[in-house]
Amino acid sequence: MQEPLRIVVIISDPALVAEGDEQAQAIEERSRLLRIGLLEAGYNLVATLPADVFLTERLAQLQADMVIVDAESDARDALEHVVMATRDARRPIVMFTNDSNTQHVNEAVAAGVTAYIVAGLAPERIHPILTVAMARFKREQALLA
């Protein structure tokens, strides 16, 4: 039997979230649903981390197989940290967001995001999304080899 994927979820920096903010509460609920969906699907959720300057070292220590970015208002900053943290040890990056702006989608894919999922965080969809993301990542890596 294959070991479950080791997944690290990157979240919005909690210091940037104002208490009582409805958007922040919606983001927190989405993040909770994501974590529940990962655990229910049998994934090994090894950490939930903020996107910060320590991310490269943390990802190296945790040896994650896949990185999931769950961010909204600071998604660009989070993505920049994730891309920098994974440039030497490539791994699939899946981004869950409510931002359907075409320019942001294109920028994320150009930066190395394997799957950019807009408004698709139903727990039952997580496993198929991650399966496709991993298959796409492996295919891209084979083409680069």
List the model feature ranges, each with a label.
Residues 20, 26-31, 51-57, 65-84, ...:
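Conserved phosphotransfer microenvironments
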